[in-house]
Amino acid sequence: MAKARPVNLNAEMTFAEAASVTVATRSHELFACADRVLDTEDIERVHDMRVASRRLRAALEVFAPCFERRAHKDLLREVKQLADALGERRDPDVQIAGLRQLREELPPSDHPGVDLLLARAREQQSAGNTALREALEAVLTHDLRGRLEELARP
């Protein structure tokens, strides 16, 4: 898992200033994870981006009073939708990794059953990847990054 980027806060900051810095940092962290997130061979990318989306969501929720209500509500909803799509893709990734390990531990006579489960998990992974691709396209179409940057501007 990617370690959280430090947020440069200090005791002299107002709550609103802390909100700006925190949301900007967490937003940057989220989009830094986007590279190769659709690669089904590198499942840690999805995990890292999902964790980053949770951190951003938490920051948006904690600092809600600092932002214009409508813009905040829309952005929080979109971050949640992205997190849901990341989860839809991540869950089968975890299943596949577990099933691969289980297959290695079982006798060959049990492999066909595990192979069937692996095939189903791969189908779910593919469907999750499609949902994630669509969510990422929506992020670009609706300029989520730019709107988060605008929200975080002091």
Residue ranges and their predicted role:
Residues 1-154:
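Function-determining surface determinants
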